Amino acid sequence: DEYTFKHSVDVATISMIVAKQQGLSPEEVREIGVCGLLHDIGKTKIPNAILNKPGKLDDDEFALMRQHSTYSYNMIKDRAEFSPAVCLGVLQHHEKINGSGYPMGVSAEKICPYAKILSVADIYDALVTERPYKKAYSQRDAVEMIMSMTMELDITAMKSFLESMILYPVDSIVELSNGEQARVVKNIPHYILRPVVVGLTSGNVYNLG
């Protein structure tokens, strides 16, 4: 469906940016982009009534939805053009480092590097996208939720993701907690939620970090 196509392109793009931030080789960056494009291809085997259900999935529907990563893997694993690393990244993109993910429930040491990056990108894009069953979160709220998932997401992938994000571009206008509007004049590495701003009314400089 249209959402899955857009989501896959978004996840591929975000994953490649994170991979570059981590210093991966050009070939690894390309491969993780392929992972992003293919990670949800198995959803073509899930009924649209489940994919776009406006309410909460029941247990049987959720069990079927959880099969999509296995379906994706099975659709590409015998294709010569896709490396084992790409196939494993697709299979494991819903695994969590504490073993609470699926389809295999493996923990950090058994999750491939591509999947660790894909997981962060997949969750972020899902959070900021409106779906029939939920509203979209703001980028800031989504980043804060990502930052809270230290027991589930790989720390290195998470840090690289955060370092590559620019939530408040220079010259953008924000509203401060005191109600004053301010212009962003500088972003601070590692503190993406707290830029340096100048109040439009007061002229005061606020270092929100």
Predicted regions and their residues:
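Histidine- and acidic-residue-rich, metal-dependent catalytic cores
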Residues: 1-209
